Amino acid sequence: MAKQVAFNEEARRALKRGVDVVADAVKTTLGPRGRNVAIDKKFGSPTVTHDGVTVAKEIELKDPFENMGARLLVEAATKTNDVAGDGTTTATVLAQAIVHEGLRQVAAGANSMMIKRGLDKGTAVLLQAIRDLAKPVNDRTDISSVATISAADSSIGDLIAEVMDKVGKDGVITVEEGKGLGYETEYTEGMQFDRGYISAYFVTNSDRMESDLEDPYILITDKKISSIQEILPVLEKVLQFTKNFVIIAEDIDGEALPTLVLNKLRGTINVLAIKAPGFGDRRKAMLQDIAILTGGTVISEEIGRKLDSATVEDLGRARRVIANKDETTVIEGRGDEDAIKARIEQIRAQIETTTSDFDREKLQERLAKLAGGVAVLKVGAATEPELKERKHRVEDALSTARAAVEEGIVPGGGIALLSVLPALDSVVPANQDEKAAVLILRRALEEPIRQLARNAGEDGAVIIDTVRRLQKEKGDSTLGYNVITGEYGSMVEMGIIDPAKVTRSALQNAVSIASMILTTDALVADIPEKEAAPAPGGMGGMGGMDF
């Protein structure tokens, strides 16, 4: 297919037009006074959203060169969303401002590579200043404030703070569509996995169709048990202490299963047999998690152990094990605290190094089951568009709250970026172009607060001047403007705070994408094919004639 090519100024101007289309649509959603954007869907009702990244992802432009600029900006928003869960609109606003100022300098004769080098120097200093500005999240109020700002709804903020308080910072919180009109929460205590009892004959509560064992001994193995003789030695030893016995194995079949069922029905032993969760390497890891949580040992031939060698010391313990046909919950495992902490740190390290989103999600689930708990947040609404929009806001608020716990909080409302501007004084530019890059950053970092003011119908320049004057007079870098009340004051005291991770990621990704655009000198794209004109219709047949 033939290609079209654009060079230098023409190429950069095309990218800028694409950037502007996306940024102008997205930045209207910034802040509590931000507007909604309606997105047409081929099927069903339109989506009405206040979420920047959702708007950005939907934009596709006809001109291939302009579309490249649009896609690059979407990349900045998406990357920020992936890393921090929020801050997509801020990243978009910053990137647009850097592109505008940068292109002006390049058009005036500046070297784009020197501009990029200056941007990199300035950004490194600013990122460190944001980290230094951050304060750790100490209480539930901070989490509530962060989530409230993200969702623009205090009820969502309070709900997320309550849920995070219950399941802990490492707990798994999932968001689902509910059946009602409001919000519902479900909690799971202990470790839960998606495998239930092997046979309904193990049920102890026929009303709830559950097997509920108090203070059982737990045999954990990755083997299939086919003969009762394999586990008879350990069974006889357990019966000296208790009748409550749980077996977690790859499978139980052959004569082993009917023998266990028969002894359960006779009352000889109160046994519960469960299939091991997961598959392959993940199964081995999950069995090891269960063993560490309960203080047991996984009986596996990989470590040279056979089932008939199992002793009471190899068995895990828990206050309670509950199983139905679909899932099992182990409550208050009696494992060693230090061993559990070491396992948690090991999983955390794996989360940091993995490149697969799927693996990361599964590792986070395992971490939550060991360290915290599991909560399900069910979101309801009167109509489907409202439900989707509300669910988006809850997911964003949850991600923002997690980011705040991770790296701390900074003043919100664009004030954090304004507060770190003096850090640029320490940058030593090697030439005039690098000096121009520092000036580009100074101008760009004011843009989020200008846009917040614009969305609230205020004059951004006046607000920035007033904020700077008040900060200088009172010596307080947290002073800012509340666009909801129209008052100046400490952003932290007013509960207007952002996660440092969100602010940092937004700046980092905005500079990265803007630098890429500024240093682009050629664009190559397919020449769009003209659609062929429809063929003329055939002649109508003549009625009454058979051939």
From Swiss-Prot:
Ranges in a coiled coil: none
Principal cellular location given in the protein's record: cytoplasm
Gene3D superfamilies xrefs: GroEL (3.50.7.10), GroEL-like equatorial domain (1.10.560.10), TCP-1-like chaperonin intermediate domain (3.30.260.10)
Disulfide links within the chain: none
Reactions catalysed according to its record: ATP + H2O + a folded polypeptide = ADP + phosphate + an unfolded polypeptide
Gene Ontology annotations of biological process type: protein refolding
Single GO MF descriptor: ATP-dependent protein folding chaperone
E.C. designation(s): 5.6.1.7
Annotated ATP binding sites: T29, L30, G31, P32, D86, G87, T88, T89, T90, G413, D498
CDD domains, A to Z: GroEL
Keywords from the UniProt entry: ATP-binding, Chaperone, Cytoplasm, Isomerase, Nucleotide-binding
Cellular component annotations (GO), alphabetically ordered: cytoplasm
Compartments, record wording: Cytoplasm
Matching Pfam families: Cpn60_TCP1
Family indicated by similarity: Belongs to the chaperonin (HSP60) family.
Stated role: Together with its co-chaperonin GroES, plays an essential role in assisting protein folding. The GroEL-GroES system forms a nano-cage that allows encapsulation of the non-native substrate proteins and provides a physical environment optimized to promote and accelerate protein folding.
Subunit structure: Forms a cylinder of 14 subunits composed of two heptameric rings stacked back-to-back. Interacts with the co-chaperonin GroES.
The protein's name: Chaperonin GroEL
